[in-house]
């Protein structure tokens, strides 16, 4: 992730998704606000993806071309004059199956000054598997964690969690996975945005809360094979 450089980030995402697909991946996941970093402070309005049109066009078409599902992280979005932190999910046909607006905005970094909190459903289906997505700070709150975990076989958590607190993200994912008996797939950003260093350390948790696979702090493609009941 390169801070405030959406063109570079779209190109990088395209490259990494293609590489993952070539390696046999059937579902690719991107982190929170991967296109701009969290939060873009200069030229913010110009960096907004109007109604997620660029994501829908470029990432949706990539899903169709590669015949893979893509949980396309989240982007800064403007819809009907309001700004949201929005996650999009595409199936193998490139069809948009979910558009979810972050429910719990990260007020310590003034996210609530920039975005409107959402209240949309976070569940969807891919390849017949019930899934859900939550965004970063959401993982600390019963809404939407409870609905996501009770109505899914796997919860995708996309985040921009800083390096200094990345152990908290892991602990929360493990606790929720064990409590609800579901898989958690956490995709966390790495790199630097402004003065904040993000921690990477993306991971997969089993239904028992134990880690199946975990990435390091730098950029990498993390894969895991999951067998659903």
Range-by-range predicted roles:
Residues 1-5:
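Short polar catalytic/cofactor-binding loops
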Residues 6, 15-92, 99, 163-182:
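Cys-nucleophile CN-hydrolase/nitrilase-fold catalytic domain and related Cys-dependent amidase chemistry
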Residues 8-19, 139-146:
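Short, acidic/polar
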Residues 36, 88, 100-106, 203, ...:
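Short beta->alpha transition motifs characteristic of CBS
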Residues 51, 78-150, 164-171, 227-228:
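Active-site catalytic loop in hydrolytic enzyme cores
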Residues 51-71, 140-221:
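CN hydrolase (nitrilase-like) catalytic-core segments centered on the catalytic cysteine
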Residues 72-73, 86-89, 122, 202-204, ...:
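Short beta-strand scaffold segments in enzyme catalytic cores
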